[in-house]
Each structure stands twice: as C-alpha cells, then as structure tokens.
C-alpha cells in the first residue's frame, strides 16, 4: 500500500529553512581571500555568491549567466533584495545551491518578452540540472511583470529540488514552470509556504509544464504540506508525475496530471482535513493514504482528455467524493480498502466500486438517485442520508449492505450483492419493487430496520434476523419471514408480515397498525401485541396460531383465514374483535379485549367456562363452539342479520335481549335461555340437530322449530315452556327436565 512521504533530514543553516536530502547551503558573507568580511550588495568569492541588505539594496543585476554558471552556492541574506527589471534575476546551469533567507526577495518585472538564456522566457529564477533552491520563511520570489512567458521559477533541466517556506508569486506567467525536452527524471517541489498566481484573479496556471516540441517526459513531484497554499491551477506535463497533498494544505485551482505518463495523486495526513474543490483530471490513480485525516473532493474526477482511466483508492482514513463524475473515462473505478471509508453519491460514484476487508463505501444520498454501476468485493457498503438510492446493477459484493438512513430500492435480489452477502440495518429502509427471495443474514441494530414491499409483490426473506432493533414493515405487499429470528420486535405499518415458525417475529412485541400478520403453520407465540387501527391475524387453513401474550391498543382485532387463532392473554385492546373467517379460541373473557364481538360466517370457540356481558353482532352466520364440560355465559345483547349457530358439546347460555335475525341452530351441546328474547328476533326459527334447547324460566314463543336430528327440549323444575309455533323436521322431539 502506498505510504506518505516523510520529510527528510533537517538543518538550521537559515532562518526556518529545512533541507530535503541536499547538501547544506552555507551562508557566505562575501569573505575575501584573507578571511576579512567585505559586505556588499552581491559579491562572489570563489563559488559563493552572497547578496545582503547592504547598500546598494536592491541589487538590479542578474546573478549568473545561464548554463555556464554551475556549482555555485548563492545566498540571498535576510532583508536582501534582487530586483532585475526586464531581465533574469538568477539564471544558472547545473549543480547550484540557491537559498533565500528570511525576508529576502528576488523579483523581476518583465514587460518586453525575450528568449532568455534558455530560450524559455525571462524567468525570475531559472536553472538547468540538479539544482537546489531553498526559500526561507517570509522570503519571496516574484515575477511581477506582464509577460505571460516570464515565470517566477523555471526548470530547464531535471533532478532539481525547490523547497519553499516563503512565497513564490507570478502576476502573469506561472509561479513554477517545468520546461525541458527529454526530461526522464522528475523535478521536485516541497511547499510549506505560498505558491500563487495573481493572474485572472488566481484562476490561471500556477504550476505548469511546456508541451510539444518533442517534450514527452517532463516529470514532476509536488509536495504540499500542512499550512502550504497553492493558488491557481496545476497543469503537469506528459511525464510521470506525483502529487502529494497533506491535510491542512490548500490548492484552490484544478489539478491536471497531463495527457501522458503515469500520474498519481496522494492525499495524506494523520489528522485534520483537506479539500480540493476544483476538477482533477488525467491522473491514473488518486490515493487516500494514512489514517486520521479526512479529504473531500468536490470537483469532477476522471474527465481525462488522455482517455486513460482513473482509479480512486481509499487506503486509510476517510475520502469524501461529492463532484459530478458522470464524465469519468471508461474503466474508471473506486476501491476502498480495509479500515478506510469512501463516501460518494450517485452523481460522484464511478461505474465500479470495490470494497475490501473492513472498508466501507458509503452512499450519502440526500436526494433520490440511481446507481447502475457494479458493487463488488468482500467489504461493506452503506446507505446514509435521507434520499433514496436505487441499485440496478448485478452486484457481487460478499460483505454487508449497511442501511443507516433513507431507502435502498431494488427490483431483483442480485442488486443486493452475492447471495451470501449480509444486510445490516440501523435506521434505514430496504424497498423492494418486485417478487424476490433472499437468504441473506440480517442484523437490525438499535436504530431499527424497515422493509418496504411494493403492493402486489412478496419478499420472501429466508435468512435469519438478529439484533436488538425493531423490524418495521411498510408498503402494501407481503414480507414473508421464514428464518429463526431473534430481532427485537416487529411493527407492521402496512401490508402483511407472514410467518411460518415460532421464531419468525423475533424476540420482541408485535404492533399492527391497520395491517396484517399471516401465519402459514402451527405457531406458538408468547409476545405482547398492540393493535392500532385494525390489526388483522390471518391463519392458514388447517393451522393454529396460539397467541398467549397480552394484546393492547386502541384498535380492533380482526381475524381472517380459515385457520384458528387462539388468544391466551389478558388483553385490553379497545376496538373489539371481528372474526371474518375461521375460528377464534379463548379460555377466558379477558382474552377478547375490551370491545364487542363480530362474527361474519366465522366461529368463536370457548375452551373454558366463563361469562361475558359484551355485545355481539352476527353479520353473517356466527358460530359459538363450547368445549365439552364447559359453559359459556353470554349476557350481552347479540344483533345482526346472521344466524347463531351452536357447536361443541358444552353449553351456551344466552342472557341478552337479542335481535339477531337469522335464527338459532344448535348442532351440538346445549343452548340455554331464560326468556324468548334470548333467542333473537321473534321471527327467527330454532333448529335442533341432535342437540338441546334448555329453558330456565317460564315463557312462551311463537317461533317455528325444525328437528333435523333429534331435538331435546329441557325445561327446568317449576317452569313452563310454551311453544305455539310449528315444529317440523325428520328428527324426534325429546323432552327432558322436571319442568313443563
């Protein structure tokens, strides 16, 4: 993995100036041959050239004569100034060491251009090969003229090193210019200070390279350390270029690696942050290295005139990419490595993103967006931000998709990565828009996890649900849970949750908000439940759902499906119980909550003896099934258009002033009444099918009766039952009891 370049050896030969692997520059005080001090403006003693602040200051000539001036040590002392006007200030060849001490200044102001000593313009400071330029704190190199071909510093050769703690400035040309044909070795810039152009308000080339004339290998290495500032655009040449930027540094303009060569950008730092706000182009690699620092790239990446692809690597720390990268060259991609975090959105993400190890590639999506690229690798991906992320690609990652905020929308299981990938919820939503099946293991953390299933579709989730958070179901479709789950509870706000084993709902409570729980097998549950609005329990034919926990809430409990729902808790739900299909079984009145009972071609089965004063409505036929040896006392009024049907070998005691219109059919056991009004509307008939009608009071009735099997009339001692209505049927009339 690439590592950050560390500063080399330091020394204190000049005020605040550190060296980078070069021979120390010696401050020369223009010593004479006999060692006596001879201060002047700029003087030469052997290979040493010293400029100080003595009069005349500034010095207005040129130090050096181009390629013939080599192996010199040139020192511009504190406060000294070289102002060369329409000419070079320093122009030397090979092997020179140049230093500007604190508050020194070297400048020119070229207005009438000329070829200069290297046919490269009248640059302020220029040199050929293997030179070292040290610019101390508060020192300044400036090209202050109007000629755009006159640069503040110009490389006309290779293996040169510039270290800047002061300011390098240009009013028209570049602050630093790289010009050479056949330059196979990089020139190097270490910046701790300011490198700037003031041309066009700072929106001009500040560090650049020549093009054409066969110059195809101009390489450059640029370091911008914390506190360093580069104002303007950096446009590198056609060689192999390396740019290393440390958190806390500033580059205001765009960054262009050049049309050829291998160009690499490193984003470094162990603390703090850095940001590049303008476009980055023509780089083969952009590498975020070192932990601790966060870098943000808000310009475009990879819109390369060279056509080469750009690979963005997040090796350590955090890299945030927010620009529009839709024009990135073909093959451009992003990779995040173990321990690092890459943040993108659907506009800034490149066509392929790979996450490895413990790395996380996060889509921070504040608005809705679609990503059609490919997500791969063994690492993790995350969804953050309130917006929706629609994934349409065939993704192959084997790590986790972490849903923290907003929605991830998918239409096929392969949008969620490999079949063995994972889902981790902590506040986010998975929205499925078509039928699909997934065996992915899922974790729901404290922030909860929402499954939104589109209407008319079913999401079969066979993987296990873990975690202490709550599963929330949205959408009109069906979420089928068949894993052995252990999550922290289930809230169904819309549609249906379907379970097929005792563990489908995890370890917590159930809440139904105008929604439905469907069971497809015999299931036993002890969890508490809440019904807000109608809460529907749908049980498949031939199956029983035993719900032994208490059920509360302001809503009604609605029973659908041909199967059986057994209620065993002390329930307080206020909206009543509506049985539209199948059977509800109870041991006690408290299991039916606080409201009325409605039976619509459905059954209430009592498994123990108890009495209730609740009202009941028979919208279709309503069956009361009493277990042998038990008595159900129903003293509340029973109304509705349907018939009351009695099954089971136990006894149903009716005590209300009932108005149900469909008559009374007793198919097993006994119905016991004390007065005619207990048997519903006066026009309603009674049918006995090998069953019994017991009267405990004296009364008469004109209602008809049918004995489809033997029909027993049991009259209590001391009472008389007067039956003036017609009695028909194939069965026998049997009289029991001591009454008349």
Task: Give residue ranges: language-model regions.
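N-terminal secretory signal peptides that target proteins for export/translocation
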Residues: 1-18
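Beta-strand-rich solenoid/repeat architectures in extracellular/passenger domains
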Residues: 48-61, 72-86, 99-120, 131-149, ...
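Extracellular repeat turn/loop positions enriched in glycine and acidic/polar residues, especially those
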Residues: 52, 77, 93, 101, ...
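Tight coil/turn sites that cap or link beta-strands
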Residues: 54-56, 77-79, 95, 103, ...
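Glycine-rich beta-solenoid repeat tracts in large extracellular/virion proteins
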Residues: 57-67, 86-94, 113-128, 148-157, ...
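Conserved consensus positions within extracellular tandem repeat modules
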Residues: 95, 103, 129, 158, ...
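Surface-exposed loop/turn positions within long extracellular repeat scaffolds
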Residues: 147, 200-201, 228-230, 245-252, ...
């Amino acid at each position: 993995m690439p590592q950050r370049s560390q500063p080399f050896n330091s020394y204190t030969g000049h005020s605040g100036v550190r060296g980078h692997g070069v021979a120390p520059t010696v401050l020369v005080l223009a010593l004479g041959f006999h060692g006596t001090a001879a201060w002047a403006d700029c003087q030469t003693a052997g290979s040493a050239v010293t400029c100080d602040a003595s009069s005349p200051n500034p010095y207005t000539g040129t130090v050096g004569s181009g390629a013939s001036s080599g192996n010199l040590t040139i020192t511009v002392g504190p406060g000294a100034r070289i102002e060369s006007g329409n000419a070079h200030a320093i122009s030397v060849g090979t092997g020179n060491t140049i230093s500007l001490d604190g508050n020194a200044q070297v400048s020119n102001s070229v207005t009438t251009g000329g070829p200069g000593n290297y046919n490269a313009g009248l640059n302020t400071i220029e040199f050929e090969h293997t030179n070292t330029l040290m610019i101390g704190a508060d020192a300044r190199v400036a090209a202050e003229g109007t000629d755009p071909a006159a640069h503040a510093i110009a490389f006309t050769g290779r293996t040169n090193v510039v270290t800047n703690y002061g300011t390098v400035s240009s009013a028209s040309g570049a602050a630093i210019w790289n010009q050479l044909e056949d330059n196979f070795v990089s020139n190097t810039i270490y910046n701790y200070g300011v490198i700037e152009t003031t041309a066009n308000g700072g929106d001009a080339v500040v560090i650049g390279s020549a093009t054409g004339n066969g110059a195809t290998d101009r390489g450059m290495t640029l370091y911008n350390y914390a506190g360093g500032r580069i104002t303007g655009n950096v446009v590198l040449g056609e060689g192999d270029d390396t740019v290393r930027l440390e958190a806390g540094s500033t580059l205001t303009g765009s960054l262009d690696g050049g049309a050829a060569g291998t160009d690499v950008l490193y984003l470094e730092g162990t603390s703090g942050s850095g940001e590049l706000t303008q476009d980055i182009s023509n780089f083969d690699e952009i590498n975020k290295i070192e932990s601790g620092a966060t870098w943000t790239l808000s310009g475009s990446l990879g819109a390369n005139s060279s056509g080469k692809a750009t690979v963005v690597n997040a090796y350590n720390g955090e890299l945030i990419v927010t620009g529009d990268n839709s024009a990135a060259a073909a093959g451009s991609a992003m990779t995040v490595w173990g321990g690092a975090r890459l943040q993108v959105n659907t506009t800034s993400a490149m066509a392929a993103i790979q996450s490895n190890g413990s790395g996380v590639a996060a889509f921070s999506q504040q608005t809705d967006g679609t990503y059609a690229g490919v997500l791969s690798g063994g690492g993790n991906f995350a969804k953050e931000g309130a917006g929706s992320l629609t994934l349409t690609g065939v993704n192959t990652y084997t790590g986790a998709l972490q849903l923290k905020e907003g929605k991830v929308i998918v239409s096929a299981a392969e949008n969620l990565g490999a079949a063995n990938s994972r889902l981790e919820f902590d506040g986010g939503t998975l929205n499925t828009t078509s039928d699909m099946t997934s065996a992915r293991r899922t974790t729901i953390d404290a922030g909860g996890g929402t499954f939104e299933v589109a209407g008319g579709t079913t999401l079969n989730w066979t993987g296990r649900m873990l975690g202490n958070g709550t599963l929330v179901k949205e959408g009109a479709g069906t979420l089928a849970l068949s894993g052995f789950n252990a999550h922290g509870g289930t809230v169904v706000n819309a549609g249906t949750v379907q379970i097929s084993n005792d563990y489908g709902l995890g370890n917590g409570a159930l809440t139904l908000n105008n929604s439905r729980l469907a069971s497809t097998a015999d299931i036993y549950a002890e969890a508490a439940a809440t019904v807000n609005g109608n809460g529907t329990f749908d049980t498949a034919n031939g199956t029983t759902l035993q719900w032994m926990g208490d059920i509360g809430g302001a809503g009604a409990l609605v029973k659908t499906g041909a199967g059986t729902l057994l209620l065993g808790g002390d329930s307080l739900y206020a909206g009543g119980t509506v049985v539209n299909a199948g059977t509800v079984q109870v041991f006690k009145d408290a299991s039916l909550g606080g409201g009325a009972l409605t039976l619509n071609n459905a059954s209430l089965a009592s498994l123990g003896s108890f009495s209730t004063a609740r009202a009941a409505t028979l919208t279709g036929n309503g069956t009361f099934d009493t277990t042998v040896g038990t008595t159900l006392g129903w003293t509340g009024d029973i109304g509705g258009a349907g018939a009351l049907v009695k099954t089971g070998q136990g006894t149903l005691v009716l005590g209300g002033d009932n108005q149900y219109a469909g008559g009374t059919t007793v198919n097993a056991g006994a119905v016991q009444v004390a007065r005619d009004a207990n048997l519903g509307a006066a026009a309603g008939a009674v049918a006995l099918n090998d069953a019994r009608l017991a009267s405990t009071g004296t009364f008469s009735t004109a209602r008809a009766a049918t004995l489809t099997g033997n029909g027993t009339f049991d009259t209590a001692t001391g009472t008389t039952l007067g039956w003036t209505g017609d009695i028909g049927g194939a069965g026998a009339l049997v009289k029991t009891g001591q009454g008349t």
